């Protein structure tokens, strides 16, 4: 709603406008170079003014969010307070135009708000250092919005199926132990693949706003066609601006696929593109090529992504429940898109969702202490041959940068103590060198390996000094703009280099399984294709401009409650179709230098200890050739030596204790020097790109 077009330039500010939030807390915290309050942004706009007698009111509702703590379904967090409801009702009765500003990091209660008859509802998210200015620019018509929701907003929290199995406060004691390891609260993914629009659309449940919802001051028309040939779905969409207002539009592609014998979503989002700024009458043709794997489903019985036989409807539009079929094609037989390895197999069958979309109440239970772990007994860590000892002229890391074939000889020069040193991140408490960097890698004057620093940074270079503060990742996802994600990565790289940072601990690619996850702003979306695509473009922007990116957190880091031990019970089809598909898609587009594992165990094993995950899947199937690090302090619950044996290359943040632990493990033959050499080789392959 453009205020100047409807009621002049005067506005009244109500609600939490003085608490306007621009950032989450934790890993995605920004420390902006500068920012404006909402009143300052109004004054600076020159187009609007604050007036007690205005006919238009902006009512601000603010909610914080971030790392270490999930949000709760209580008044003042997910739900509106009684005071907020009373003030909203009063404003709706008093003002001709009521515009509600949702300055929240996650979706909140919408039932009451929808009943107010507000002129407009705007979600700002945590919009970075220019958030208040951007909001006012949109309201006064200086900027034409073109975003779409990257998540479905339910009317009520308990409308979402994962609400029944998010934080299981009735079962938060360890369910079993294995050699002293503690597994915390059980988290049963009974909703399976029915997350977000996949649930609401498939079972025709009412939602406040669907995935893909978005408004603009422009009016666009889209003419589309599609073809399916040689495993590629090609969609051509001609977008025309039929209005006087220049604007951008995004085209979203979905496929309605046969459901087969298992409960599966009605349709799948599988591709998108965004136009340039189109003036009145201008048109642009977008071509969207979608690999068939992106609308396939996983069959754990044959360990493959398949397309079931039957009719496929190709659909184009925006909001998931308001899209149109543009063509159909029929497969006479099942098609195997890709054979895979099996990882993280569940110990018992998940009971799942019934035919009406109800999450069953007879929860899956792991009843035997060793059952989940026994499933993984077949997984073995790889063995390596020790490198022949090099006896020529000393080789430095700079020599390896010039000639990568010298890598083996270079690493063979490392002593056992040096190998152990490079397996442990040398810095903790986010203060190496007092810069606020998250950590630093080991260095060696003898081998000419410099000290390299890393920092958090999905939306800023997170240090003890001001840097550019971008909007949070869930807001970036709402742009549906690949090139913009790349540009964010580029600027993060430029500022990282200015501040002596070589490795960015982002982007984060965990899904919005539940809207109350504390790290909701830090992750992109409820959809794996959108998330995987944007994180790949952001990572490319970082690395093509000289800073290493880190895909995190592998796998299913979907809650902060007991995050180092909360035990996810997830069937393999769901893992492959949702929580692994994010990374699968990202790796198909860009392979970064680093991967960070998640804290949480999944199906009886911690990801940093899971050799099948780190080797068979990550390295062999996905082609990753960088190094794997734990999340900070994963060794509080996971086993450090098992992690290194399984293929984890770097323990973070690390300490002398872990250095000594590795040396003792070598003496006890729990880990070989050859395995450490292989691990350090993976790290050095990445470091040569930083010097």
Over which residues does each language-model region extend?
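Glycoside hydrolase catalytic-domain context in secreted enzymes
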Residues: 4-300, 306-322, 337-691
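Extracellular and select intracellular beta-sandwich modules with Ser/Thr-enriched
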Residues: 323-327
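Short beta-strand edge segments in extracellular beta-sheet folds
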Residues: 328-338
């Amino acid at each position: 709603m453009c205020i100047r077009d409807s009621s002049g330039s005067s506005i009244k500010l109500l609600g939490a406008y003085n608490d306007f939030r621009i950032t989450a807390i934790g890993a995605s915290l920004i420390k902006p170079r500068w920012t404006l309050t909402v009143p300052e942004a109004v004054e600076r706009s020159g187009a609007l003014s604050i007036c007690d007698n205005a006919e238009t009111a902006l009512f601000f509702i603010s909610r914080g969010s971030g790392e270490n703590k999930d949000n709760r379904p209580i008044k003042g967090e997910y739900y509106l307070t009684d005071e907020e409801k009373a003030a909203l009702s009063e404003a709706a009765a008093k003002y001709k135009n009521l515009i509600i500003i949702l300055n929240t990091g996650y979706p909140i209660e919408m039932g009451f708000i929808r009943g107010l008859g507000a002129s407009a509802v705007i979600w700002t998210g945590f919009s970075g250092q220019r958030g208040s200015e951007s909001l006012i620019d949109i309201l006064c018509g200086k900027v034409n919005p073109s975003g779409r929701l990257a998540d479905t907003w339910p009317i009520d929290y308990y409308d979402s199926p994962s609400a029944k199995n998010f934080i299981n406060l009735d079962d938060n004691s360890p369910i079993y132990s294995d050699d002293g390891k503690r597994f915390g609260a059980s988290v049963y993914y009974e909703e399976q693949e029915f997350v977000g629009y996949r649930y609401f659309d498939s079972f025709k449940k009412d939602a406040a706003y669907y995935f893909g919802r978005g408004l603009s001051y422009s009016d666009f028309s889209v003419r589309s066609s599609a073809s399916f040939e040689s495993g590629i779905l090609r969609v051509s969409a001609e977008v025309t601006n039929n209005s006087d207002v220049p604007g951008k539009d995004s085209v979203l592609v979905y496929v309605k696929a046969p459901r087969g014998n298992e409960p599966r979503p009605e349709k799948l989002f599988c591709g998108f593109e965004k136009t340039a700024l189109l003036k009145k009458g201008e048109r642009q043709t977008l071509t969207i090529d979608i690999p068939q794997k992106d609308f396939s489903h996983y069959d754990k019985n044959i360990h493959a992504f398949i397309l079931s036989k039957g009719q496929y409807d190709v659909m184009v539009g925006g909001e998931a429940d308001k899209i149109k079929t543009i063509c159909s094609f029929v497969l006479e037989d099942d098609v195997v898109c890709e054979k895979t390895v099996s990882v993280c197999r569940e110990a018992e069958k998940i009971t799942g969702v019934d035919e009406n979309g109800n999450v069953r109440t007879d929860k899956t239970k792991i009843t035997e202490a060793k059952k989940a772990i026994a499933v993984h007994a077949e997984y073995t860590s790889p063995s390596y041959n020790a490198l022949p000892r090099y006896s020529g002229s000393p080789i430095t890391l700079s020599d390896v940068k010039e000639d990568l074939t010298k890598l083996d000889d270079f690493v063979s020069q490392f002593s056992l103590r040096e190998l152990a040193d490079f397996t442990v991140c040398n810095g903790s408490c986010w203060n190496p060198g007092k810069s606020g960097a998250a950590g630093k890698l080991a260095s060696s004057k003898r081998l000419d390996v410099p000290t390299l620093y890393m920092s958090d940074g999905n939306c800023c270079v997170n240090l003890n000094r001001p840097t550019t503060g971008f909007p949070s990742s869930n807001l970036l996802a709402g742009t549906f703009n690949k090139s913009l994600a790349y540009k964010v990565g580029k600027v993060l790289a430029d500022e990282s280099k200015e501040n002596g940072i070589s490795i960015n601990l982002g982007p984060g690619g965990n899904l919005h399984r539940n809207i109350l996850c504390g790290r909701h702003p830090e992750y992109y979306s409820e959809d794996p294709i959108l998330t995987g695509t944007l994180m790949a473009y952001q990572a490319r922007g970082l690395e093509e401009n000289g800073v290493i990116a880190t895909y995190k957190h592998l796998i299913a880091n979907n809650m902060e409650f007991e995050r180092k031990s909360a035990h996810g019970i997830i069937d393999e089809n769901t893992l492959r179709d949702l929580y692994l598909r994010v990374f699968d898609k990202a790796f198909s587009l860009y392979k970064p230098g680093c991967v960070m594992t998640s804290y949480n165990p999944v199906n009886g094993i911690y990801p940093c200890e899971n050799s099948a995950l780190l080797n068979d899947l990550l390295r062999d199937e996905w082609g990753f050739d960088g190094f794997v690090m734990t999340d900070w302090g994963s060794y509080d619950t996971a086993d450090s030596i098992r992690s290194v044996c399984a293929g984890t290359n770097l323990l973070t943040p690390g300490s002398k204790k872990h250095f000594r632990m590795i040396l003792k493990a070598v003496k006890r033959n729990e880990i070989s020097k050859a395995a450490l050499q292989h691990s350090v080789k993976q790290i050095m392959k990445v470091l040569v790109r930083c010097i």
